[in-house]
Structures are given as structure tokens and as C-alpha cells.
């Protein structure tokens, strides 16, 4: 398994009771995560100082509650810059765990010794396409 551990602008700080506390740049967001099944105390101070909290609705979907959070902001991963924005379905426009894949294929592209063309048919956020282009691929 590859772990996306080269982030400086993103981290999962804590998780409990079906939610995770994440740092996206200088902003703290709380979002639901169905894989967080443990019920540990939320003692991390970020739980009380969050900038955004996505509340899941019992009917499906949900809504954000904001506390001093801009409409959008940027974070960096190595030489890549991403614009983030909370969407109505809990996402921010980026999946940081995919950085391990960006590193892997970026290395393959740089070491190929030939022109590389990439057609990303799974370009949900554009992160992989941006990483491939930065590594030298024609996208």
C-alpha cells in the first residue's frame, strides 16, 4: 500500500464518531466519514476551532456550516497548487490520498526518456492530469 505522506498543506488530525478533522492549508474542516466507526473522545482542540463543518442529513446529502472560512483558497502539494472550495456534497475538490499515485506516475513520466502522452479518462478533480503535465507529459 502506498501512503500519501508528502503533504505539507493537508493532514488528517483526528477522527471519531463518524467524522474526521482535517487541516487543508490553514483551515480546519470536519467532514463525515463512514469508515470512522470508533467512539473515542474528541479531545483535539481543532474540534472546537474548526472553520467548516459538514452536517450529514438523515434524508441524504447535508450542508456546510462555516466559521471564518473563505469561499475558496489554495493549497500546495510539492510544485502543484490547487484551488479548494467546499461543495454541497461534502467534498473540497481534491482527494489528497491520490498524491501517492501522482508521485508514482510522475516519476515514471520523468524517467521515461521519451515524450509521454496522457489521456486521463478518470479526471474527476483534475489533480492527476495536473500532476502528469507538471511531470512533463502532454495531456
Positions of the model-derived regions?
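Conserved SAM/SAH cofactor-binding pocket of Class I
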Residues: 106-139
